[in-house]
A protein has these predicted regions:
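Short, well-ordered coil/turn segments that N-cap beta-strands
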Residues: 7-11, 35-37, 65-67, 82-84, ...
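Active-site mouth loops of central-metabolism enzymes
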Residues: 8-25, 105-110, 163-169
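Glycine-rich phosphate-binding active-site loops on the catalytic face of alpha/beta enzymes
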Residues: 13, 88-100, 129-141, 166-194
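Acidic (Asp/Glu)-rich catalytic clusters
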Residues: 28-35, 60-64, 99-102, 121-124, ...
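A short beta-strand-loop structural module common to alpha/beta enzyme folds
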Residues: 38-46
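Alpha-helix-loop-beta-strand connector modules within alpha/beta enzyme cores
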Residues: 52-71, 90-93, 97-113, 143-166
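Catalytic cores of alpha/beta
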Residues: 69-84, 112-125, 156-187
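Glycine/Thr-rich beta-alpha phosphate-binding loop at enzyme active sites
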Residues: 81, 85, 108-155
Length: 194
């Protein structure tokens, strides 16, 4: 179904345990079996301690399947757990020192405008997620930014850009995003329901 890429289009799984019909760790294992580019552990409602506990378990599963695990928001936990990939909101990334950034080999940043994309690249981001591209239940009531936005972001930065928001297991959608210059897409709902 996934196998890391469609042609060269890369798929990153984004977690949301509230969307799972089965145990979350079982769902992570199912996701790893379809071989995504990476798994972003994005559980925004957890406390730092709860996130640390869950991150250890998810990293173990990802390591078993040799799928990169990217920790979200809690960068100090990533350092503590020796996870070298992290995904951050731009406001958190802005305050990281150069020394703190050096602790990671990959830093992804969520952006919602061309200006944010340029700033994130200047600050040293490895890749960006830009969105939301399509209508999604996660952003109910908010109109999607669309493919034109994605194209503009991809044109203005030289680092890899992944579309996020309403992305499905849909080759036509992937082709459209690839034509905009995106290297891949991030799937949440579809990944939590496979």
């Amino acid at each position: 179904m996934c196998n890391r890429s469609y042609h060269e289009f890369k798929i990153i799984a984004v977690s949301n345990r509230k969307l799972c019909d089965r145990s979350f760790l079982e769902q992570i294992e199912r996701v790893c079996k379809i071989d995504p580019e990476a798994v972003i552990l994005r559980e925004k409602d957890l406390t730092e301690e709860e996130y640390r506990t869950l991150a250890k378990e998810v990293m173990e599963i990802c390591n078993h399947y040799q799928i990169p695990c990217i920790l979200h928001r809690f960068w100090k936990i990533a350092v503590e757990l020796e996870c070298t990939a992290v995904h951050l909101p731009l406001p958190i990334f802005r305050v990281l020192s150069d020394e703190e950034k050096k602790k990671f080999t990959k830093i992804g940043i969520s952006v919602h405008s061309v200006e944010e994309a340029k700033e994130a690249e200047q600050l040293g981001a490895s890749y960006l997620t830009a969105g939301h591209i399509y209508a999604t239940d996660c952003k109910k009531g908010l109109p999607p930014r669309g493919l034109e936005f994605l194209k503009e972001v991809c044109r203005e930065v030289s680092i890899p850009v992944y579309g996020i928001g309403g992305i499905k297991f849909d080759e036509e959608q992937w082709n459209d995003m690839e034509k905009c210059g995106a290297v891949g897409g991030c799937i949440m709902s579809g990944m939590m329901e496979i």
